[in-house]
């Protein structure tokens, strides 16, 4: 649940008549009204106050209708559904004095709505809509999520290392990826964001998880999604680089060698990787047993038209495996 907040500035003031506070400021002049969503729900009584020293001659309109909704410095409305949300504007004569935008956050049967984002069907066991990965222990990580919504969509991302840790985590703006992902038999759009912990010590033991919150607004609907993780749990190295083959004299085997990816943490004697080596036949389904090694080379057979592929992961903590890097036997 999003922390509930009360806007107490004298201008553009938004108040509730109900005893339980269910409205808070998302950004300047934009407010989220939290509603229990069920048939015949009473909704929330909201009082809007015009941001002006003027007292007389004030009228109110909304973006749903040009008709005058009321007059005076305040306007009381009952917010029950999306038709009651939107932008409310106060005027005097032909001049706009101020406006407030109301968004709705639905709760059905005690659960906040999650309509905007979609879960990746490739990971049916995933408990979160947000997926994050880090290529190393530098404190830099990338997160992404999927949505079937293509227009009237806005995201903001917030992150921190625990709620009381002063070390901030800075996230950039969410960007739309060119990649399309199939979810529920239709294409979904993928958004990504890059984040960096301000004061990161790669060799230090993590005691507090990183908290990530993505706020999503689609038209007049507000939702938020969160994830909590340690960097060590989202590590996924880049693939090994510079794969090379060296024929061995009087042997059917070859020596395949590789190097640590440039993006992996150093020194490698401390931040060590382990590797998986596999021979893949001409037809992709023809795969031989996997060989696991800690060094950066291995001896394998390399039939004509086959290829050798290698992937990496953290040696001392069971991180995710990297993508495969491959070299042809031809």
Swiss-Prot record:
GO molecular function: cytokine activity; cytokine receptor activity
Any one GO cellular component localisation term in the record: extracellular space
Domain Ig-like C2-type: 23-106
SMART domains, A to Z: IGc2
Location of the Fibronectin type-III domain: 239-330
Subcellular location: Secreted
Any Pfam family the entry gives: IL12p40_C
Disulfide-linked positions: 50-90
Residues listed as glycosylation sites in the UniProt record: 136, 224
The protein's name in its UniProt record: Interleukin-12 subunit beta
Gene name linked to the record: IL12B
């Amino acid at each position: 649940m999003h922390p509930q907040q009360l806007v107490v500035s004298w201008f553009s003031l938004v108040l509730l008549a109900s005893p339980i506070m269910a409205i808070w400021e998302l950004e300047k002049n934009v407010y989220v009204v939290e509603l229990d969503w069920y048939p015949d729900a009473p909704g929330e009584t909201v009082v809007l106050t015009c941001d002006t020293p003027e007292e007389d001659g004030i009228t109110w309109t909304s973006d749903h209708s040009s008709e005058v909704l009321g007059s005076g410095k305040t306007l009381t409305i009952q917010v029950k559904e999306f038709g009651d949300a939107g932008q409310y504007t106060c005027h005097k004569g032909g001049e706009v004095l101020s406006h407030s935008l109301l968004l709705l956050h639905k709760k059905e049967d005690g659960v906040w709505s999650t309509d905007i984002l979609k879960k990746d069907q490739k990971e049916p066991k995933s408990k979160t809509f947000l997926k994050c990965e880090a290529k190393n222990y530098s404190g830099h990580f990338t997160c992404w999520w999927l949505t079937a919504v293509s227009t009237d969509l806005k995201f903001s991302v917030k992150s921190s290392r625990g709620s009381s840790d002063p070390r901030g985590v800075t996230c950039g703006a969410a960007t739309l990826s060119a990649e399309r992902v199939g979810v529920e038999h239709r294409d979904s759009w993928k958004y990504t964001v890059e984040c960096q912990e301000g004061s990161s010590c790669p060799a230090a033991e993590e005691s507090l998880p990183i908290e990530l919150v993505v706020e999503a607004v689609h038209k007049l609907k507000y939702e938020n999604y969160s994830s909590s993780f340690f960097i060590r749990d989202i590590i996924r190295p880049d693939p090994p680089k510079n794969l090379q083959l060296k024929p061995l004299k009087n042997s059917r085997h070859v020596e395949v060698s590789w190097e640590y990816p440039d993006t992996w943490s150093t020194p490698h004697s401390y931040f060590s990787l382990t590797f998986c080596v596999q021979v893949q036949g001409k037809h992709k389904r023809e795969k031989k047993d996997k060989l696991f090694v800690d060094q950066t080379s291995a001896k394998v057979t390399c039939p004509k038209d086959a290829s050798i592929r290698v992937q990496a992961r953290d040696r001392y903590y069971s991180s995710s495996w990297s993508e495969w890097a491959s070299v042809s036997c031809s």
